[in-house]
From Swiss-Prot:
Enzyme class: oxidoreductase
Function: Histone demethylase that demethylates 'Lys-36' (H3K36me) of histone H3 with a specific activity for H3K36me3 and H3K36me2. Also active on 'Lys-27' (H3K27me) of histone H3 with a specific activity for H3K27me3 and H3K27me2. No activity on H3K36me1 and H3K27me1. Involved in the control of flowering time by demethylating H3K36me2 at the FT locus and repressing its expression.
GO cellular component, as recorded: cytoplasm; endoplasmic reticulum; euchromatin; nucleus
Cited Pfam families: ARM_KDM8_N (PF24472), Cupin_8 (PF13621)
Cofactor binding annotation: Binds 1 Fe(2+) ion per subunit.
Protein name: Lysine-specific demethylase JMJ30
Length: 429
């Protein structure tokens, strides 16, 4: 990966990444790796400590092969930690050379694919490298201030007649692109400033979806994330995994690793084709990029019923991205930070009528393509009752466990999902 940010030759004589956990655990970790047959890795790692870039990259490649030697759940934790170690060695060498882009790329791969042992070293190193990189470019403080750059989603015109015209055209467009019968059945109820007691009584316990409005205004993300200059400043050089293709059920679907700035550029210019959109989907971005994590707040609703947060994921993509009909095992709040989405929901008791896949890996996904229903193959699906809504910017949707849902972005969209369960639900799921 080519570094976007590099220090001049005279600026990096004293650049060093402190890695206290790696320093303390290195010998023990190498012994554990050797015990699993990783003798060649251990030899390369020793050379990497001395600054041998080829050896550091060779060790990283060896660990990468182990990560892809079988199903992810079967990979030994020691090899995940080995990959983190190698990424740190590669990053240290690039950082010492003032190659900040390459260093950040290596650290991000460690955060995305590595184990937990060296995670603090990875995070702390990202902060230090990012700080040095910002000295060479526009500062974060400037980008966080008075935003005047390009917006991801244009502001609505203030002229009343123009607003009506835009809304009328938007409604016609939406109806053309949405699945058959959209917005004709029961709409998901919207509640403004819903109390925790009301949420528990009326929606959580009965297991009923609800759209909650006026509960995200205090999030810094509500203003910051609509500005490309801010997103590029805090995360532009970071490496993220993206999906390319219509959706994960299609044969041509694939994954790529790109810098966040390249991903934003694809969204902004709509360079990906409608059949191959680029989507940053269900990625724990906020475990990786702390600055973006600081821009959001965990809704208090996620702690109702003695709940514990299970995962926190980002869903960033252009208009037209689709998550096909599926269900999840946990309570879910989907917070719409930028843009808008159409969401259709079916209750869990309609599982048989929605024809789930029999394969274990896809058993939570429906064979029914709502965008093109085959009535001959799936005769029960066409007439099923459902609930749906258009989730507007600044709104949150509560989706109960096991409720089937289909999601389509109507504009460029940045969303955050919060999954949570109580102890009893976690043990049974």
């Amino acid at each position: 990966m080519s570094g976007a940010t590099t220090a001049s030759s005279g600026d990096h004589n004293n650049l060093r990444l402190p890695t206290p956990t790696l320093d303390a655990e290195s010998q023990t970790l190498l012994q554990s790796i050797s015990a699993e047959g990783g003798y060649a890795y251990a030899r390369m790692a020793v050379l990497a400590v001395a600054g041998d870039q080829s050896a550091a990259e060779a060790a990283r490649d060896m660990a990468w092969e182990q990560l892809h030697s079988g199903p992810w759940h079967s990979v030994l934790p020691v090899w995940r930690d080995a990959y983190s170690m190698a990424c740190l060695h590669v990053a240290k060498i690039h950082f010492a050379a003032g190659e900040f882009g390459e260093a950040l790329g290596a650290l991000d791969m460690g955060l995305i694919m590595g184990g937990m042992l060296l995670r603090k070293d990875l995070h702390d190193s990202v902060l230090l490298v990012s700080s040095e990189a910002r000295k060479m470019t526009k500062s974060l403080e400037e980008a966080s201030g008075d935003f005047k750059g390009e917006r991801l989603v244009p502001e609505v015109p203030v002229d009343v007649n123009e607003v009506r015209h835009v809304l009328a055209n938007l409604q016609l467009l939406v109806l053309k692109i949405l699945p058959c019968r959209s917005l004709t059945c029961k709409r998901v109820e919207k509640r403004s400033g819903l109390s925790l007691e009301g949420f528990l009584r009326d929606y959580y316990l009965p297991g009923t979806p609800v759209v909650i409005t006026n509960s995200m205004a205090h999030w810094p993300a509500r203003t910051k994330w609509n500005h490309l200059d801010y997103l590029n400043a805090v995360a532009g050089n970071r490496t993220v995994p993206v999906e390319v293709g219509k959706n994960y059920l299609c044969s041509d679907w694939k994954q790529e690793l790109v810098t966040f700035s390249k991903f934003l550029e694809r969204m902004r210019t709509n360079k990906s084709s409608p059949m191959e959109p680029t989507y940053l989907a269900q990625h724990p971005l906020f475990d990786q990029i702390n600055e973006l994590r600081d821009d959001i707040c965990i809704p208090d609703y996620c702690f109702v019923g003695g709940g514990e947060l299970q995962s926190l994921n980002a869903w960033f993509g252009p208009a037209g991205t689709v998550t096909p009909l599926h269900h999840d095992p946990h309570h879910n709040i989907l917070a719409q930070v930028v843009g808008k989405k159409y969401i259709r929901l079916y209750p869990s008791f309609l599982q048989d009528e929605l024809y789930p896949y029999s394969e274990t890996m896809l058993c939570n996904s429906s064979q029914v393509d709502l965008d093109n229903i085959d009535e001959t193959e799936f005769p029960k699906a066409m007439e099923l009752e459902f609930m749906d809504c258009i989730l507007e910017e600044g709104e949150m949707l509560y989706i109960p466990p096991k409720w089937w849902h289909y999601v389509r972005s109507l504009t460029m969209s940045l969303s955050v999902s919060f999954w949570w369960s109580n102890e009893a639900e976690s043990s049974s799921s």
